[in-house]
Design a protein with these regions (language model features):
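N-terminal hydrophobic or amphipathic helices/low-complexity stretches enriched
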Residues: 1-16
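N-terminal capping segment at the start of a domain
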Residues: 12-29, 177-179
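Cofactor-binding active-site loop characterized by glycine-rich and histidine/acidic residues
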Residues: 20-24, 35-166
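Glycine-rich beta-alpha junction loops
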Residues: 71-72, 76, 179-180, 214, ...
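Short acidic, glycine/serine/threonine-rich loops at helix termini
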Residues: 77-78, 106, 156-158, 184-188, ...
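Short secondary-structure boundary/capping segments
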Residues: 83, 190, 249-253
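Thiamine diphosphate
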Residues: 112, 116-119, 124-228
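Glycine/aspartate-rich loop-and-adjacent alpha/beta segment that forms the canonical ThDP
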Residues: 205, 215-281
Length: 281
């Protein structure tokens, strides 16, 4: 990765985070914490990794993305708007009646959304089905799915993992956002899924553990995923819930709460300062 590539990704991630804050503030509802923790991954996927076309969202040869942790839709919408799938001003209609941007992704309403999700544990199952279908059809499409570490407390996740390994889905990349927090507190206290890497390996996955805010590590993991044959690939990314907004970081209270006007102003100010710093690099 060149220095300029890294800079452009960092700039994009700052803008995606601002989009998240703008959307949930306008809606007065939503899930900023997990959207911000995954913002760097959203950015890398849609700006560099995936084969997609904003002008033709239903392009048959595109790669597929399934947001299994569907409540973090503001993060997905933030990057889709940034990439031109729809106008950024649409973000201000989040969760409104008649808007194509609802609280959870809807594949029939939002350009760039490949699967309607929200019921935790089900997204990965549909991603496995997409990857298996691509294999049967002899297509080169890759399938990516993003889960939360709290989400993997759901039993259905592990049935899907078992199927992915059984069918040798090396076109599937399962990404787990390990920010350590869920709505009720620490994931380890609610129902510990740890250690995650060993569990994925036991289910037949090749695994990479990375810093989910380091673009070089993200790129290295995806390069390894493309080189892996005969088995699915899992990326466990260590992240910070509420990343880049000081009062939201590592605070489970921001799992599903919108900022008020003062908090919004502070969050945007912090992100604008970070953007200016990155652009000046």
């Amino acid at each position: 990765m060149t220095a300029n590539d890294k800079k452009q990704l960092m700039v994009a991630a700052c803008k995606v985070r601002m989009n998240v804050i703008k959307g949930v503030h306008a809606a007065k509802a939503g899930h900023p914490g997990g959207s911000l923790s995954a913002a760097d991954m959203f950015t890398y996927l849609f700006c560099k990794e995936m084969k997609v076309d904003p002008k033709n969202p239903k392009w048959e040869e595109r790669d597929r993305f399934v947001l299994s942790k569907g409540h973090t839709a503001p993060g997905l919408y933030g990057v889709l708007a940034h990439q031109g799938f729809f106008p950024e001003e649409d973000l201000l209609t989040l969760r409104q009646i008649g808007s194509h941007l609802q609280g959870h992704p809807n594949m029939n309403m939002t350009p760039g959304v490949d699967m309607s999700t929200g019921s935790l544990g089900q997204g990965i199952s549909t991603a496995v089905g997409m990857a298996l279908a691509a294999k049967y059809q002899g297509k080169e499409n890759r399938v990516y799915t993003l889960l939360g570490d709290g989400e993997i407390q759901e039993g259905q996740v592990w049935e899907a993992m078992m199927a992915a390994s059984h069918y040798k889905l090396d076109n599937l990349c399962v990404i787990i956002d390990n920010n350590g927090l869920q709505i009720d507190g620490k994931v380890a206290d609610v129902m510990s899924p740890y250690p995650i890497p060993e569990k994925l390996q036991a289910f037949g996955f090749e695994v990479a553990e990375i810093d989910g805010h380091d673009f070089e590590q993200i790129e290295a993991a995806f390069n390894k995923a493309r080189e892996t044959k005969g088995k699915p690939f899992g990326i466990i990314m260590k992240t910070t819930k509420g990343k880049c907004v000081s009062f939201m970081e590592n605070n489970a209270g921001w799992h599903g709460k919108a900022p008020n006007d003062d908090e919004y102003a502070q969050a945007i100010s912090e992100l604008q300062a970070q953007l200016a710093e990155v652009e000046g690099m």
